[in-house]
Swiss-Prot record:
It comes from the Eukaryota. This is Acidic skeletal organic matrix protein. Residues 60-83, 224-254 are annotated as: Disordered. The keyword ATP-binding does not apply. Keywords: Coiled coil, Secreted, Signal. Component of the acid-insoluble and acid-soluble organic matrix of the aragonitic skeleton (at protein level). The keyword Secreted applies. Residues 66-89 form a coiled coil. It is found in: Secreted. Its main location: secreted. GO terms for cellular component: extracellular region.
């Protein structure tokens, strides 16, 4: 009798454990034909598209009742609606080389090297395999990488990271917190050939010869619910019950020199922008005053511009996003949680009753 009873106990443990695991994390989706990857974790879903290099993210519970969708009918098997107003999307729009005064430079007629890319969204990106059980700076995460060759032989790479646990990460001089469900994307430009007025010939914005490139402006198209995203500090975030993002272990009294900039993007979500870049993966260089620059271009559309320093090697920028629970879902979440908890409790009670009866 002992062996059957032991087997039943193990079966019970396995079954109930599977219920818990299923409720914690949803499965990912990879479609290599369409070149799309969907990563899920910690009530966050991220869609990565190889065609155009678009990255979208939103709050998502696999078992929620679709009440965050205002423009779409409910379906029996709910899927993420990345066109929902609470979703955020990011896409590299353009790259433009500029001189020391910030004016564009362009290729001369004798040069075959391009010094701007005006439609990055038309490029085809290669999509790496999804790493759904990896780490980033010792934190559990999922990652996928997009890569495209630019017309001037430079390379554009986007590494998308979805964190699965809370922790602290570093980017150059900046140390800040990430949450389970934080999504970040490294943007790496490698091998950009700058105008030097000699070996690489360029024209100024007014078609004057011997122009010299000094920086590279990389622009992102951003879609978010907030029409005019507001910069918020940790004190203001604390008013809504959010923990500090900034971490400065060297000098707690320093005036946030080593802290990223945080924007409220609407829908309880926020974007975290570093003030500097990494050159050749090791040297932290602060961006010029006024950058990164976020400006409104439409009702929900924004243009986010980073000014990158001149280098023959690589430059990395590192935006991240904390997805919050949409306000209209907050009141409904408790009901959903209670329903899920009640179902698990009922299932456990039923199985324990059967177990007791067998003994």
């Amino acid at each position: 009798m002992l062996a059957p009873r032991l087997a039943f106990v193990l079966l019970l443990s396995s079954y109930f454990g599977s219920i818990l695991i299923t409720s914690v994390e949803s499965s990912d989706e990879v479609d290599m034909e369409k070149k799309t990857v969907k990563m899920r974790g910690s009530n966050t879903s991220v869609l990565v598209e190889g065609d155009g290099g678009k990255i979208s993210t939103l709050y998502f519970e696999e078992d929620d009742d679709d009440d965050d969708d205002e423009d779409n009918e409910e379906s029996e098997n709910e899927v993420e609606d990345f066109d929902d107003e609470n979703a955020l999307s990011f896409q590299v729009e353009s790259l433009q080389e500029v001189d020391e005064s910030g004016k564009p430079v362009k290729a001369s007629k004798s040069s075959e090297i391009q010094h701007s890319v005006s439609s990055v969204g038309s490029l085809a990106f290669t999509v790496s395999a999804l790493q759904n059980s990896t780490t980033y700076q010792n934190l559990s995460a999922k990652t996928v990488t997009l890569q495209a060759q630019l017309p001037n032989m430079a390379t554009l790479e986007l590494m998308v990271v979805l964190f699965l646990e809370d922790g602290t990460i570093k980017f150059g001089n900046e140390t800040f917190k990430v949450l389970s469900g934080t999504m970040k994307f490294n943007i790496n430009v490698t091998g950009w050939q700058y105008c030097d007025g000699a070996t690489v010939s360029c024209l100024s914005d007014s078609n004057q010869p011997a122009a010299v490139g000094d920086n590279l402006d990389l622009a992102l198209t951003v879609k978010s619910e907030a029409e005019d995203p507001e910069e918020v500090d940790d004190a203001k975030r604390a008013e809504t019950g959010k923990d500090p993002i900034c971490v400065d272990p060297d000098d707690p009294n320093e005036e946030d020199d080593d802290c990223p900039v945080v924007y409220d993007m609407g829908g309880n979500s926020e974007m975290v922008l570093n003030k500097g870049v990494l050159v050749n993966n090791m040297d932290y260089v602060a961006m010029p005053q006024g950058f990164p620059n976020l400006e409104k271009t439409g009702m929900m559309q924004k243009k986010l511009t980073f000014r990158l320093p001149k280098t023959p090697g690589s430059v990395i920028i590192d935006p991240s996003v904390n997805i919050g629970v949409p306000p209209k879902k907050q009141s409904g979440n408790s009901g959903t949680s209670i329903k899920a908890s009640s179902l698990c409790f009922f299932t456990l009670t039923l199985l324990l009753s059967v177990l007791i009866a067998h003994f």
